[in-house]
C-alpha cells in the first residue's frame, strides 16, 4: 500500500504465435470505461507471457496508441499476425497485508487473491470515472468485496452481480481490476462498463453488501479516522472508549467539531495521534482517511462555530453522545470507536466527508444510493451485525461527526484514501453529488446503525430529550451557530445529515454540482459540518450561501476555501494528519476490517444480501426507532418549534435555510439515513439541540410531523413499524411507511424505509441491463458535466436561503402531507425504487411552500427519505403548485442536485446504483420519479387544499398519495416495460405500486412538468417510448377523463405550459393557465384530447424553466388561446396522422425490436437512452395511454410512437448514450421536472418513446463487435433494417416536426434539450469519425499487407495461380460490398413497407415488388459469396504451397480482415450517416419550432 493506488506502471507485453491470443477485452470508449483485459485464458498465449494480468488496461497495440476504442483495439489485434505487441497499464498496488480478515482469509484460500491483494488499495483508490480509469476502479478489494458480497446489489458488482452474482464473490480473487477481469462480464461491454463504472465509483467499497467494502465504508469511521484526531482516540479506546466516547464524545465531539473547524488542540491532538484503529477503523479509515484529507479540510474550516457554541453544543452533545454511546454501549467497540472517532473525527469527518463524499460519491456513483445503503446495511448485517451495525451506527448511525469519521473510514485502504483523496478531489465536482448519496446512504445506515446503537439503549432518547432542552436553549441563545452546530451534532450524534448535510449542502451549493452533494455528504458525515453550519448559521442566508459555496469548494478542493473561510481552521496539516492517521489507521485497519469483515461475512452468509442489507440495519433501527421515537416527538416538536418557531427570526431563517439546505443536501445525501437516524436521532438529538438542527435536516419533514401533535406517537409507531420496514421487504417498507406516512415523525423512518427500500430497489436496479448501466455510465461519465449541476445547486442554494421562511409554514405541513402521500402505497412501492420519487415529491413539496425556496427541492431531497412523496406534495402545495418556478427550480435543483437521487431520498438513485450509475447520471432518470414530483402537479387541484390544510397532512397526503401512487404505478410500469433502459430495474421496483395516476397524475404532471421532465430525462428513452404510446391513449382517455376531474386542473392538457407558468412563479398566471385549461377542458373532451395530444406533442420537450419564464409565461398567456385553437385544429389532424404513423411505426418498431433483441446494442444501447431524451419531446407531443399494458408493452407501444418521435428517438438513441448521459445529467438536472411537464404524456410517451428509441436504436445499433465478423450478414442485415427504418422515419420526421413542433410552440426547454442532444450526437459522431479514421488506417495497413502478400506470391507463384489469387481478392471485396449494399437496400424497403399506410396499396405493391427483386438479388449475392468462399479455400491451398508459414499467416490475416474491415467500415459509415441525419433533423426542428413559438 505504499504505492499510491493512483500510480500506474506500464508493462510491455509481446505475444507470439498468432491468434488466438488468449485474452479477452472489455470496456472501451464505446462503454465509457477503460479498455481492460477481462479474462486471460489458461494456457493461452497471454497467460504464457506471464506479463499480462486481468484488469490491465491496453494503451498501445503494435506501437499504435489506443484512444480507448474497443473496436479499434479489436481491429488492431485482429490485424496482428504472428506477433502482438501490447503495452498495458496497471495500477501500482504493492502487495500488502489484507485490509481485512476477509481479505486475509480469501488470500489464504486463493494465492491469486494474494497477488491481487495489492489491488485492494487500487480498488479503494478506485479511479473515479471522472478522473480515473474504471479499470483502476475495478481494482477495489476484489477478494474482500467480491468475496464478501455475492449480492447483486454490490456497487461494483451490480453489473457484475447481474452477470455473475456468484463471481461477485470471487471477483476479489480476480486481478486488481477485478471487475474488468470478470470473464463473464468480459463480453458484455455494458457489464464491463457498468461494473467498471461502479467499481470506480465505489472503489473503496464498491459493494455495500461486501463486508470489506461496507466495512471499509462503515468501519472507516472507526479509529482509522485518526485524521480527525479524536477518532483515533476513540478508536484506541475501543469499547471502553465507546463508553468513554459517550461522555468524551459529547464534549469531545462538540469540541472535536469546533476543533475541526478550528482545528482545536483537542480535536487535532486526538486526530494527530493515530490511535490503533478499531477494526472498523481499517475499513472506515481507508474510506474515512481518504475522505479525511478532503473532508478534514472541508470539515475543519466548517466548524468555525464559536467556542461558546462548541461548549453549548457540547453540553447537548454530551447528552446526545451519552445517548449515542448508551445506544452504542452494546456495541461498545464498534460504536465507541465510531462515536469517538466520529466525535473526535468531526473535523476529519468534514474532511472525511469531503473525501468520503468523494469516495462515497464514487461508491454512490457506482453503487448509487442503494449501494451505500448496502454498504451500511452490509456492515449492519454482517457478523458485525451488532458490532458492524453498531459500527455502521457509530459510523453511520452516529452523529455525522461520529459518523463522518467512522462512516467515511469505511474504506480501510489508506493508500487508497490518499490516491482517492486526489481522485476524490478530482471527482469531487462530479462525485460530490454522488458522494452525498453515499453519505446519505452511509448516514441512512448510519442513522439506522445509530439507532441500532441506541436500539438496545433507549437512553439516547432520554438524553436526546435533555439534549433537546439544552439544544433548544442553546439554539435560542446561539441559534444560528447552534443550529450549525446542531446540524453538525445532529450529523454527529444522529447522523443528522440535515445538519452536516446542510452545511455541506451549502458547500454543495457553492459548488452546486458535486459540491452540493459532496458538501451535503461531507456535512452529513462531518461534525465540522456543524461548524460550517454554525458559520452558515452565523452568516445566515448570506453566509449560508457563501458557506455553501465555500464548503462546496471545500468538499472537493475547496477545503482550502473552507480553511480560509473558516479562518483557515483546517489546514494542510489536517490533511497531512489525515494521511498519517490514515496510515496508522491502516495499520489498525486490518484488525477492524478483519473483525468487521468476518462478522459481515458471517452475516452475509447467514442472510441474503438484501436481507443482510435491510435486516441488519433495519433491525437495529427497529430497536432504536422506538427509543428514538419519543425523542423524535420531542425532536419533531423541537424541530418544528425551532424551525417553525421562534428560535429567532434569523435563527429561524438560518435554521430553515441551513436546514433546508442541509436538508436538501443532507436529505439528499442522508435522506434515508437521516430519515432513519433522524427519526431516532432527531427524536433523540432533536429534543434538545436538534429542534433547530433537526429542523435543518428534518425541517421539511419534521415540520410535517410537527403538525400532528401525535407525531411522537407516530414516530414511536413508525419507529416500531420502521424497524419492521427496515426489514428489507418492499411490502414491509411500504406498509410501515404507509403508517409512517400518516404519522408525521414516522417520516424520517419512512425515509429510512424508503432508503432501505430504495437500497433494495437499488439492488434490484443495480441489476439493470448492462445496456442500461452502460448508458447510465456514459451519461454519468460524459454528461457528468457538473456545470449544469452547479448551476442548479446554486439555485438550490439561493432557493434555500429564500425558502426557509416559507418552509416554516407551508413546508412542514406539506411535508407531512407529502410524506404521508409518499408513505402510502407510493411509498410502499417506491420505498425501494421509489424513494427517489419520494425525494422528488418531497422536494416538490418543500418547494411548494417555499415558492422561492427552490432549495426545498434539495431540501426535499434532504428530507426526501421522509418526504419523498412529501416533496411531491410540497410542490403540490398551493404555493408550490403555482410557484411553479420554485417547484421547478426545485425540481431542476433536485434534478440538478441529482447528486442524491431526487427520488432516492438524497441517495444516489437505487436504480442508478443498480446500474452502478453515477448520481450525476441522474437519478431522476433513474427513477421515473420526477414524474412523481408531478404529483405536485396533480396535487395542484388539491394544492390549495393542501395549502389550506397544510396542517392536515392526512388530507393532503391521501390525495397526493393516491396521485403519487397512481402516477408512479403507471409510470413505473412503463419503466418496467422498458427493460432496456437503465430504468428497468427501478422501473420494476417503482411499478410495484400500481398507482393509478390517471386523474391526480395529470394535474401532477402538469405542475410536475419539472418532475416529469426529470423523469423523462431519467429514462427519456424508456419513458418516451412507453409513455408516448401509453400516454397517447391513456392520456387521451385518462387525461381527458381526468379532464372532468381535472377540469379545474387542466394542467395535464398543458402540463408543460402550466409548469412554465408555475415556473414563472406566477401562481396567478398559473391559475390563469389552469382556468384557461379548464376552459379548454370544458370546451370538449375531443378538443381537449386533441389539444392535449397536440400540446403534449407540441410540448414534447421537458421544459426546464427557461431563463425568462415570466416572459415566457406572459407570452404563453398571450398566445395560449390562439395556440389552443390552433393546436385543437392541428392536433386533430396531427393525432390522426400520428396515429397512422404510430401504427406504421409500431410495426416497424416491432420489427426493429425483434432485430434489436438480436443485435447487441453497443453504440446505441446507451444511445437509446439518449434517444429517450429526444423522444421526450416527441413523446410529449404525442400522448399515449398510460395503461400498465401499454407501459409494459411500451417497448411495443413505443413502436406506436409517431414516426417522428420514434425516428427522433431512434436517432437520438443511436447517438444518445452520451447525449442521454449528457441530457440526463445536465438537461435533466437543469430541467428535470419540466422535461415531463406533459404529465400523462410524459410518462407513457416518455417511456414508450424512450423504449422505442432504445429498441430502435438497439436495433439500429450494429453489433459493435462485428468488426471481426466478416460474414455476420444476418446481424448486419438486421442492423441495416433497423437503420433503414430509422432513416425512413427520419425522412418523415421533418413533416412530423412541422406538424408537431410547428403546430406547437417550441418550448425553451425543448430547444435546450435539442441543443444538448445535438451536442451529444455531435460528440458521438466525433467518436465514430475517430473510429472511422482508425478503421481507415487499419484498412490501409491491411491493404499494405495484401500488397506484400501479393508481391511474395508473385515472386513464387505461377502467373495463372497468381491471377487466381488476384481475382479472388478482387471478387471478395466486390461480393462483400454487394452483400452489404443489397442488405441495406432491402432493409430500407422493408421498413418502408412496414411504415406504409394500409390504404396505399399502389405504393405498397411497388415496394413489395422491389423487395422481391432485392431479395432475389441478395440471394444471388449470397451464392456469390459462397462461391468466393470456396475459391478462397482453393487459393489458400495453392498459396500454402508457395508461402512459408509466416507469410501464409499474413495471407490468411489479410483475407480475413479484408471482409471484416469492409463490413466494419460500412457499419461505421451508416452510423455516422444516421447521426448526421439526426443532427440535421434536430437542427431543422429547432428552426421549425421557434417559428411557431
Curated annotation (Swiss-Prot):
<dbReference type="InterPro" id="IPR027685">
    <property type="entry name" value="Shroom_fam"/>
</dbReference>
<dbReference type="GO" id="GO:0030036">
    <property type="term" value="P:actin cytoskeleton organization"/>
</dbReference>
<keyword id="KW-0009">Actin-binding</keyword>
<dbReference type="InterPro" id="IPR014799">
    <property type="entry name" value="ASD2_dom"/>
</dbReference>
<feature type="modified residue" description="Phosphoserine">
    <location>
        <position position="411"/>
    </location>
</feature>
<dbReference type="GO" id="GO:0009925">
    <property type="term" value="C:basal plasma membrane"/>
</dbReference>
<dbReference type="GO" id="GO:0005737">
    <property type="term" value="C:cytoplasm"/>
</dbReference>
<dbReference type="GO" id="GO:0045159">
    <property type="term" value="F:myosin II binding"/>
</dbReference>
<feature type="region of interest" description="Disordered">
    <location>
        <begin position="1117"/>
        <end position="1170"/>
    </location>
</feature>
<feature type="compositionally biased region" description="Polar residues">
    <location>
        <begin position="249"/>
        <end position="262"/>
    </location>
</feature>
<feature type="domain" description="ASD2">
    <location>
        <begin position="1213"/>
        <end position="1492"/>
    </location>
</feature>
<feature type="region of interest" description="Disordered">
    <location>
        <begin position="1214"/>
        <end position="1236"/>
    </location>
</feature>
<feature type="compositionally biased region" description="Basic and acidic residues">
    <location>
        <begin position="498"/>
        <end position="509"/>
    </location>
</feature>
<feature type="compositionally biased region" description="Basic and acidic residues">
    <location>
        <begin position="470"/>
        <end position="484"/>
    </location>
</feature>
<dbReference type="GO" id="GO:0005884">
    <property type="term" value="C:actin filament"/>
</dbReference>
<dbReference type="GO" id="GO:0043231">
    <property type="term" value="C:intracellular membrane-bounded organelle"/>
</dbReference>
<feature type="region of interest" description="Disordered">
    <location>
        <begin position="1187"/>
        <end position="1206"/>
    </location>
</feature>
<feature type="compositionally biased region" description="Low complexity">
    <location>
        <begin position="1118"/>
        <end position="1129"/>
    </location>
</feature>
<keyword id="KW-0175">Coiled coil</keyword>
<comment type="function">
    <text>Probable regulator of cytoskeletal architecture that plays an important role in development. May regulate cellular and cytoskeletal architecture by modulating the spatial distribution of myosin II.</text>
</comment>
<feature type="region of interest" description="Disordered">
    <location>
        <begin position="1246"/>
        <end position="1265"/>
    </location>
</feature>
<dbReference type="GO" id="GO:0043296">
    <property type="term" value="C:apical junction complex"/>
</dbReference>
<dbReference type="GO" id="GO:0099072">
    <property type="term" value="P:regulation of postsynaptic membrane neurotransmitter receptor levels"/>
</dbReference>
<keyword id="KW-0206">Cytoskeleton</keyword>
<dbReference type="GO" id="GO:0007015">
    <property type="term" value="P:actin filament organization"/>
</dbReference>
<feature type="region of interest" description="Disordered">
    <location>
        <begin position="740"/>
        <end position="759"/>
    </location>
</feature>
<dbReference type="GO" id="GO:0098794">
    <property type="term" value="C:postsynapse"/>
</dbReference>
<feature type="modified residue" description="Phosphoserine">
    <location>
        <position position="729"/>
    </location>
</feature>
<dbReference type="GO" id="GO:0007420">
    <property type="term" value="P:brain development"/>
</dbReference>
<comment type="similarity">
    <text>Belongs to the shroom family.</text>
</comment>
<dbReference type="GO" id="GO:0098982">
    <property type="term" value="C:GABA-ergic synapse"/>
</dbReference>
<keyword id="KW-0597">Phosphoprotein</keyword>
<dbReference type="InterPro" id="IPR001478">
    <property type="entry name" value="PDZ"/>
</dbReference>
<dbReference type="GO" id="GO:0098978">
    <property type="term" value="C:glutamatergic synapse"/>
</dbReference>
<comment type="subunit">
    <text>Interacts directly with F-actin.</text>
</comment>
<dbReference type="GO" id="GO:0009898">
    <property type="term" value="C:cytoplasmic side of plasma membrane"/>
</dbReference>
<dbReference type="GO" id="GO:0030864">
    <property type="term" value="C:cortical actin cytoskeleton"/>
</dbReference>
<keyword id="KW-0217">Developmental protein</keyword>
<feature type="compositionally biased region" description="Acidic residues">
    <location>
        <begin position="1132"/>
        <end position="1159"/>
    </location>
</feature>
<feature type="domain" description="PDZ">
    <location>
        <begin position="10"/>
        <end position="92"/>
    </location>
</feature>
<feature type="coiled-coil region">
    <location>
        <begin position="1382"/>
        <end position="1488"/>
    </location>
</feature>
<feature type="modified residue" description="Phosphoserine">
    <location>
        <position position="1019"/>
    </location>
</feature>
Amino acid at each position: 500500500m505504499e504505492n499510491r493506488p493512483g500510480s500506474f506502471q506500464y508493462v510491455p507485453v509481446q505475444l507470439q504465435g498468432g491468434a488466438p491470443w488468449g485474452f479477452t477485452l472489455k470496456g472501451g470508449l464505446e462503454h465509457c470505461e477503460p479498455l481492460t483485459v477481462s479474462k486471460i485464458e489458461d494456457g493461452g498465449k497471454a497467460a504464457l507471457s506471464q506479463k499480462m494480468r486481468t484488469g490491465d488496461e491496453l494503451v498501445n497495440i503494435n506501437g499504435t496508441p489506443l484512444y480507448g476504442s474497443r473496436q479499434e483495439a479489436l481491429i488492431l489485434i485482429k490485424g496482428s499476425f504472428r506477433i502482438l505487441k501490447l503495452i498495458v497499464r496497471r495500477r501500482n498496488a504493492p502487495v500488502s497485508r489484507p485490509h481485512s480478515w476477509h481479505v486475509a482469509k480469501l488470500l489464504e484460500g486463493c494465492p491469486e487473491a494474494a497477488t491481487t491483494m495489492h489491488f485492494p488499495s487500487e480498488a479503494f483508490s478506485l479511479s473515479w470515472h471522472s478522473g480515473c480509469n474504471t479499470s483502476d476502479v475495478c481494482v477495489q478489494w476484489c477478494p474482500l468485496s467480491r468475496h464478501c458480497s455475492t449480492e447483486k446489489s454490490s456497487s461494483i458488482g451490480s453489473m457484475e452481480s447481474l452477470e455473475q452474482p456468484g463471481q461477485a464473490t470471487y471477483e476479489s480473487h480476480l486481478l486488481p481490476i477485478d471487475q474488468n477481469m470478470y470473464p463473464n462480464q468480459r463480453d458484455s461491454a455494458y457489464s464491463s462498463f457498468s461494473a467498471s463504472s461502479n467499481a470506480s465509483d465505489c472503489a473503496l467499497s464498491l459493494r455495500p453488501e461486501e463486508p470489506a467494502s461496507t466495512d471499509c465504508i462503515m468501519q472507516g469511521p472507526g479509529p482509522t479516522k485518526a485524521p480527525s484526531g479524536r477518532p483515533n482516540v476513540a478508536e484506541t479506546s475501543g469499547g471502553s472508549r465507546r463508553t468513554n466516547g459517550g461522555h468524551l464524545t459529547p464534549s469531545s465531539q462538540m469540541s472535536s467539531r469546533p476543533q475541526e473547524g478550528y482545528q482545536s488542540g483537542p480535536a487535532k491532538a486526538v486526530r494527530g495521534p493515530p490511535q490503533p484503529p478499531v477494526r472498523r477503523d481499517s475499513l472506515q479509515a481507508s474510506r474515512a482517511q481518504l475522505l479525511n484529507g478532503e473532508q478534514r479540510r472541508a470539515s475543519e474550516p466548517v466548524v468555525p462555530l464559536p467556542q461558546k457554541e462548541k461548549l453549548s453544543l457540547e453540553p447537548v452533545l454530551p447528552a446526545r453522545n451519552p445517548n449515542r454511546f448508551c445506544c452504542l454501549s452494546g456495541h461498545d467497540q464498534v460504536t465507541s470507536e465510531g462515536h469517538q472517532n466520529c466525535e473526535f473525527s468531526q473535523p476529519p469527518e468534514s474532511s472525511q466527508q469531503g473525501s468520503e463524499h468523494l469516495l462515497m460519491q464514487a461508491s454512490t456513483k457506482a453503487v448509487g444510493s442503494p449501494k451505500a445503503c448496502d454498504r451500511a446495511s452490509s456492515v449492519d448485517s454482517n457478523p458485525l451485525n451488532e458490532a458492524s451495525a453498531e459500527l455502521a451506527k457509530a459510523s453511520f448511525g452516529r452523529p455525522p461527526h461520529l459518523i463522518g469519521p467512522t462512516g467515511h473510514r469505511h474504506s480501510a485502504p489508506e493508500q487508497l484514501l490518499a490516491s482517492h483523496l486526489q481522485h476524490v478531489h478530482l471527482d469531487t465536482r462530479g462525485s460530490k453529488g454522488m458522494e452525498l448519496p453515499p453519505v446519505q446512504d452511509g448516514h441512512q445506515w448510519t442513522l439506522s446503525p445509530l439507532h441500532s446503537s441506541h436500539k438496545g439503549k433507549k437512553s439516547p432518547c432520554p438524553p436526546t430529550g435533555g439534549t433537546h432542552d439544552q439544544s433548544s436553549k442553546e439554539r435560542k441563545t446561539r441559534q444560528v451557530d447552534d443550529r450549525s452546530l446542531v446540524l453538525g451534532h445532529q450529523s454527529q450524534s444522529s447522523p443528522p445529515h440535515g445538519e452536516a448535510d446542510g452545511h455541506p449542502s451549502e458547500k454543495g451549493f457553492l459548488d452546486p454540482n458535486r459540491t452540493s452533494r459532496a458538501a451535503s455528504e461531507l456535512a452529513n458525515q462531518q461534525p465540522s459540518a456543524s461548524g460550517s453550519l454554525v458559520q452558515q448559521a452565523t452568516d445566515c442566508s448570506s453566509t449560508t450561501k457563501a458557506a455553501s459555496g465555500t464548503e462546496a469548494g471545500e468538499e472537493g478542493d475547496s477545503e482550502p476555501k473552507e480553511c480560509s473561510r473558516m479562518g483557515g481552521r483546517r489546514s494542510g496539516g489536517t490533511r497531512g494528519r489525515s494521511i498519517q492517521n490514515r496510515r496508522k489507521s491502516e495499520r489498525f485497519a486490518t484488525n477492524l476490517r478483519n473483525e468487521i469483515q468476518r462478522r459481515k461475512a458471517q452475516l452475509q452468509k447467514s442472510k441474503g444480501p438484501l436481507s443482510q442489507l435491510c435486516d441488519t440495519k433495519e433491525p437495529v433501527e427497529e430497536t432504536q426507532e422506538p427509543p428514538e421515537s419519543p425523542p423524535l416527538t420531542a425532536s419533531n416538536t423541537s424541530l418544528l418549534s425551532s424551525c417553525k418557531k421562534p428560535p429567532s427570526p434569523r435563527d429561524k431563517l438560518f435554521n430553515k435555510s441551513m436546514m433546508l439546505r442541509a436538508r436538501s443536501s443532507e436529505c439528499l445525501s442522508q435522506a434515508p439515513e437521516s430519515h432513519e437516524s433522524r427519526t431516532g436521532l432527531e427524536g433523540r438529538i432533536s429534543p434538545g439541540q436538534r429542534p433547530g438542527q433537526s429542523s435543518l435536516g428534518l425541517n421539511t419533514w419534521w415540520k410535517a410531523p410537527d403538525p400532528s401533535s401525535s407525531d411522537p406517537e407516530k414516530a414511536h409507531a413508525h419507529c416500531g413499524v420502521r424497524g419492521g420496514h427496515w426489514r428489507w421487504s418492499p411490502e414491509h417498507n411500504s406498509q410501515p411507511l404507509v403508517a409512517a406516512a400518516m404519522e408525521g415523525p414516522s417520516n424520517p423512518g419512512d425515509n429510512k424505509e424508503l432508503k432501505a427500500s430504495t437500497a433494495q430497489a437499488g439492488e434490484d436496479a443495480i441489476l439493470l441491463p448492462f445496456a442500461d448501466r452502460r448508458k447510465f455510465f456514459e451519461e454519468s461519465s460524459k454528461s457528468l458535466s457538473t456545470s449544469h449541476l452547479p448551476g442548479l445547486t446554486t439555485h438550490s442554494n439561493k432557493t434555500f436561503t429564500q425558502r426557509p421562511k416559507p418552509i416554516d409554514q407551508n413546508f412542514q405541513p406539506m411535508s407531512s402531507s407529502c410524506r404521508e402521500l409518499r408513505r402510502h402505497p407510493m411509498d410502499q412501492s417506491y420505498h425501494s425504487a421509489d424513494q427517489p420519487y419520494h425525494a422528488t415529491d418531497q422536494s416538490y413539496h418543500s418547494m411548494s411552500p417555499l415558492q422561492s425556496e427552490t432549495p426545498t427541492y434539495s431540501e426535499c431531497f434532504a428530507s426526501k427519505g421522509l418526504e419523498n412523496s412529501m416533496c411531491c406534495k410540497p410542490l403540490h402545495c398551493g404555493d408550490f403548485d403555482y410557484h411553479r418556478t420554485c417547484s421547478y427550480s426545485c425540481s431542476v435543483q433536485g434534478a440538478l442536485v441529482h447528486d442524491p437521487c431526487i427520488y432516492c431520498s438524497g441517495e444516489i438513485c437505487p436504480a442508478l446504483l443498480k446500474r452502478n450509475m453515477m448520481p450525476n447520471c441522474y437519478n431522476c432518470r433513474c427513477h421515473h420519479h420526477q414524474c412523481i414530483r408531478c404529483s405536485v402537479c396533480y396535487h395542484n387541484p388539491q394544492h390549495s387544499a393542501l395549502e389550506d390544510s397544510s396542517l392536515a397532512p392526512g388530507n393532503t397526503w391521501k390525495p397526493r398519495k393516491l396521485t403519487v401512487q397512481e402516477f408512479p404505478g403507471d409510470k413505473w410500469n412503463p419503466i418496467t416495460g422498458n427493460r432496456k433502459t437503465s430504468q428497468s430495474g427501478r422501473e420494476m421496483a417503482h411499478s410495484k405500486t400500481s398507482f393509478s395516476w390517471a386523474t391526480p397524475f395529470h394535474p401532477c404532471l402538469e405542475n410536475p412538468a419539472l418532475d416529469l421532465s426529470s423523469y423523462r430525462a431519467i429514462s427519456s428513452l424508456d419513458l418516451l417510448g412507453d409513455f408516448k404510446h401509453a400516454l397517447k391513449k391513456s392520456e387521451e382517455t385518462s387525461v381527458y377523463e381526468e379532464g372532468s376531474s381535472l377540469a379545474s386542473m387542466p394542467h395535464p392538457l398543458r402540463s408543460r405550459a402550466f409548469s412554465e407558468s408555475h415556473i414563472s412563479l406566477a401562481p396567478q398566471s398559473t391559475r390563469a393557465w389552469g382556468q384557461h385549461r379548464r376552459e379548454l377542458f370544458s370546451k370538449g373532451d375531443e378538443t381537449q384530447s386533441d389539444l392535449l395530444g397536440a400540446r403534449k406533442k407540441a410540448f414534447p420537450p421537458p421544459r426546464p424553466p427557461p431563463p425568462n419564464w415570466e416572459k415566457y409565461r406572459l407570452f404563453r398567456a398571450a398566445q395560449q388561446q390562439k395556440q389552443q385553437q390552433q393546436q385543437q385544429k392541428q392536433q386533430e389532424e396531427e393525432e390522426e396522422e400520428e396515429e397512422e404513423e404510430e401504427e406504421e411505426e409500431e410495426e416497424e418498431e416491432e420489427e426493429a425490436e425483434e432485430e434489436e433483441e438480436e443485435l447487441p446494442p453497443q453504440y446505441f444501447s446507451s444511445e437509446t437512452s439518449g434517444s429517450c431524451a429526444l423522444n421526450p419531446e416527441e413523446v410529449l407531443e404525442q400522448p399515449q395511454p398510460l395503461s400498465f399494458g401499454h407501459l409494459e408493452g411500451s417497448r411495443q407501444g413505443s413502436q406506436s410512437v409517431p414516426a417522428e418521435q420514434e425516428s427522433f428517438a431512434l436517432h437520438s438513441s443511436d447517438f444518445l448514450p452520451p447525449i442521454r448521459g449528457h441530457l440526463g445529467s445536465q438537461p435533466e438536472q437543469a430541467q428535470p421536472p419540466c422535461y415531463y411537464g406533459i404529465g400523462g404524456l410524459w410518462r407513457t410517451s416518455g417511456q414508450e418513446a424512450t423504449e422505442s428509441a432504445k429498441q430502435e436504436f438497439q436495433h439500429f445499433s450494429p453489433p459493435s463487435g462485428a468488426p471481426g465478423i466478416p460474414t455476420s450478414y444476418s446481424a448486419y442485415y438486421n442492423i441495416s433494417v433497423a437503420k433503414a427504418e430509422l432513416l425512413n422515419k427520419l425522412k418523415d420526421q421533418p413533416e412530423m416536426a412541422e406538424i408537431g413542433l410547428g403546430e406547437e410552440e417550441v418550448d425553451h426547454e425543448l430547444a435546450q434539450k435539442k441543443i444538448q442532444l445535438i451536442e451529444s450526437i455531435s460528440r458521438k459522431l466525433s467518436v465514430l469519425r475517430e473510429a472511422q479514421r482508425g478503421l481507415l488506417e487499419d484498412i490501409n495497413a491491411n491493404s499494405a499487407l495484401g500488397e506484400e502478400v501479393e508481391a511474395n506470391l508473385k515472386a513464387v507463384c505461377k502467373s495463372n495461380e497468381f491471377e487466381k489469387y488476384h481475382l479472388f481478392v478482387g471478387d471478395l471485396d466486390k461480393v462483400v460490398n454487394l452483400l452489404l449494399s443489397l442488405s441495406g437496400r432491402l432493409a430500407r424497403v422493408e421498413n418502408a413497407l412496414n411504415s406504409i399506410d394500409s390504404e396505399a396499396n399502389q405504393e405498397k405493391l411497388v415496394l413489395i415488388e422491389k423487395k422481391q427483386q432485392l431479395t432475389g438479388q441478395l440471394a444471388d449475392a449470397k451464392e456469390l459469396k459462397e462461391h468466393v468462399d470456396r475459391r478462397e479455400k482453393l487459393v489458400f491451398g495453392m498459396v500454402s504451397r508457395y508461402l512459408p508459414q509466416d507469410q501464409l499467416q499474413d495471407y490468411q490475416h489479410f483475407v480475413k480482415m479484408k471482409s471484416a474491415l469492409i463490413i466494419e467500415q460500412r457499419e461505421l459509415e451508416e452510423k455516422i450517416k444516421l447521426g448526421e441525419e439526426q443532427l440535421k433533423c434536430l437542427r431543422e426542428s429547432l428552426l421549425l419550432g421557434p417559428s411557431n413559438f
